[in-house]
Structures are given as C-alpha cells and as structure tokens.
Amino acid sequence: MKRTIAIVAGGDSSEHDVSMRSAEGILSFMDKEKYDCYVVEIKQGNWNAYDTDGTTYPVSRADFSFDTPDGRREFDFAYITIHGTPGENGILQGYFDLIHLPYSTSGVLVEAMTFDKYVLNNYLRGFGINVADSILLRRGEAYDEEAIAKRIGMPCFVKPAADGSSFGVSKVKEADQLAPALRVAFMEAEEAMVEGFMDGVEISQGIYKTADKSVVFPATEVVTSNEFFDYDAKYNGQVQEITPARLAPETAKKVAETTSRIYDILHANGIIRIDYIISKDQDGNDKINMLEINTTPGMTATSFIPQQVRAAGLDIKDVLSDIVENQF
C-alpha cells in the first residue's frame, strides 16, 4: 500500500514563493510507485492540499487530514520544504510532534537553533568549528557604529539573525553604512547580526544520514559577480555553480569530514546543506569556515542538492525515498 506524503510548502516569510518552487521539484522527484503525494500550502493561516490535477482541499489543523469525494485522507509523512517560518525554525516540527506525524527534517531544538545564525555560530564555536566573529543587535536598541566597526572590522555583513535566502542581507564597507543596512535587516527580523567578512571561496555541501548509511554529497563552488551570494544571485541565475568544487583533494576531504561532524554535533535529520568560506590561514593553508546551515535546502531541479546528487551518481528519487523510509 502506498504511503500518503504531504509536501509542506509556502509559509509566512518572504521566501513563500521560493518554497513553492521547491515543492514542485520534490513532487517531480518523488517515487510515484511508492507514494501518493500532495503539496500542502501554508499561507496566511490557510492550509490547503493540492492534488496533481489541481483540485484544492482544505487541511484540518486538528489532525492534518482533509476530505475528498472519496472520503477522509490522512498523511503518513510530511516532507517539509518551507524556507523560513514556520517550517525552518521548529514551529511546524513541534506541531507534527504533537500529532505524531513523522517528518523529513531535524527536530524542534535543532531547527530553532540553526535558524538563528548568532546562536548557531556560538554553539558550534564551542566544538571548535571556525565561524566569523559577530555582534547581535535588537530592534530599537542603541548601538555605536564606530565601536562595531572597530570590533568586527570592515567590510562586514549585516543580516537578520533568523532568516534565509539572503533577504535583508547587506555588505557594509564603511561604518556609516551600518545604520541603513540594519534598517533593512530589521524589516525581516527582530534581531540582526553584524558579522565579520571572510575572504575566500564559497562552497556548499549537502549531507544526509539514515540508520544504515551516511551520504556526503560533492560540494558546489559558488562563483558570482555580485558583491556576495545574495537573493538575486541565488534565484535569478547571477551565479556560476561548479559541482564538484575546485578544491585540493585534502581540503575536499576535510570539508566532507567537517560536514559529517557538524551533522552529528547537531543530531540533525534529513537532508541539510552547509555553506562554507574556504579562506587562507597565516601560513597560506586552506581554512574551513562554517557560514550557514540550511535544514530545508532548495529542491528545484537547478538547486544545489539535486546538482550534488547527480554529481554523486545517485538518483534523487532514491535519496528522497531514503529520507521517508528512515522514519518507519
């Protein structure tokens, strides 16, 4: 008997449309011989399931079921692909825990922590993971631009502490640019982070583990003519993505080991993607710096994870089946 899968997408953040595109990708990748799939869109308090023929069914938030002409349907599994709240910060995971529905991502604590970049950086620093120096600021809080510039250095990045897809992120080159950059960041979140600039090569690497396997995908190198890998670069093609990344073999091995270690430190679940900056230390050796973790990475046909799956010689259909079946 086929399992019924909810591909949960949308959400209440600026990333709603990006999430819906990922849902379309996952729907196309899923093994239809094993699973009956519905996209469930969450938007402004409305939860709706979409059949493959476009029919819409309101979803009950009491038990995550919906009525069809053939009777009530219940889901066996939720594949969460919301980028931002409530799917990437632990809220939706808590709901699914309450109704005892298995899902694709890490649990509440891991999702909440990885969504808050400042908290995540400080947590991983305690395990010896290299991260940028940063300062946390809250909306309405007084701050000294010159003191921040002296502490963090210039250039630096200003970003929402809890957000994704580079919404609200600015590269700041002078202290007097901090105030307008913070205003942009505070449009997306209550807290903003001023983070030191790390000069180097940006790469991104996906990973997943199940009860019987550990799969680290080939890393992708990100080359952009933009100031940084911003929203425009990510989603409007202003970037060159090279998979596998052009890394020295020893560096590639160390990055993969770091990716696996971070996954274990977090007790992560499902597919996650970790972004890094590969800089040079004072001796000219490659230094691996963790930049960000994506626990619901993009899943369109051109997103990093599908690219990396292909580069690894794997079938994305089988990878997604691994994620589902690991919960049963």
Spans of model-derived segments:
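Active-site nucleotide/adenylate-binding loops and adjacent lid/helix of ATP-dependent enzymes
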Residues: 2-9, 13, 21, 72, ...
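Short Gly/Pro-enriched turn/cap motifs at secondary-structure boundaries
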Residues: 85, 160-161, 196, 263-268
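A glycine- and small-aliphatic-rich helix-loop capping segment at beta-alpha/alpha-beta transitions
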Residues: 94-103, 174, 179, 311-312
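ATP-binding N-terminal substructure of ATP-dependent carboxylate-amine bond-forming enzymes
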Residues: 1-104, 108-109, 113-115, 119, ...
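ATP-dependent carboxylate activation and anion-phosphoryl transfer catalytic cores
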Residues: 3, 128, 249-328
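Residue-level detector of anion-binding/catalytic polar loops
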Residues: 36, 102, 130, 191, ...
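Phosphate-binding site of ATP-dependent enzymes
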Residues: 173-257, 280-289
